[in-house]
Amino acid sequence: MDEEPTENIGSDSGTEMGSEPATADGRAGRVVDRLGELYWRKHYGGRDAFECLVRTVLSQNTADTASQRAHDALMDRYGSETPRASGRDGGPASEASGTSSDRGSDGEHGDPRDDEGDLAAALADARRDDLAETISPAGLQNQKAETLVRLAGRVREEYDDAEAFDEFVTTGDPGAVREALLEMTGIGPKTADCVLLFAGGQAGVFPVDTHVHRIARRIGLAPADADHETVREHLETTVRDENCGFGHTAMIQFGREYCTAREPACLEGPEACPMADLCDEVGVFPETGAVVDPAEALAGDD
């Protein structure tokens, strides 16, 4: 079996599910069941919520390997030297350090891990230029450093520390948690949903990245012109709750191996794609070799 994708978010946080798939209702359920047969069926949860938030920020607009290097460097410099006592692995407050200063909100500090190993406190007080240098492998380091310092400051001010934030994410009402995350500047729907899935272990959450957005519309599981949120709503209402998590990670892997943006396997014929009998091939024209975004194909039909 191939290594699971999105190492920067969920690679080792899943536990294997039973080999018998749940009965699928409709085509979306059949697609996800087949993805489970191709790759893996796992339950997710158990990641530290704030660290998961950090991982998702680092993963934006970069490759997994690059964001993983940035994450490792950040944790080496700012993370706790020992696991938290909890044993977990892995009204809006004003934005801390919301100026162009290269320091955190509390000025200059010595060891960034002085505050009892709390990652949120360490990043809230981090020098922004030092943090940017540390996470440079992820790219857009200045922007991401500013986002991380701001998020850390808000977590510390609103929840006191990373552990309290983790408790909120893992025990709070999922809808309220998602709403609170989306109120944080720099956090979009995919990031919020990844935190709910990989940290909160919430069933029924299907984060939508570029792969999922493309594949769901190409197969015909969502309207061709649907935006990310509409795709998410379609998947979360047509895929069984317990299958949404591995459906997300397995669909990403399927997008990398078979259903790529420009050269999907179906161009070589239906036998080249394990999803051929379930796919509408919206925007894919094997007879000419043309591949367009599903929304463009829809516009062309008008």
Go through the PLM ranges and name each one.
Residues 1-4, 296-302:
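Long, low-complexity, intrinsically disordered segments
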Residues 20-300:
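Catalytic cores of DNA base-excision repair glycosylases
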Residues 1-13:
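Secretory targeting signatures
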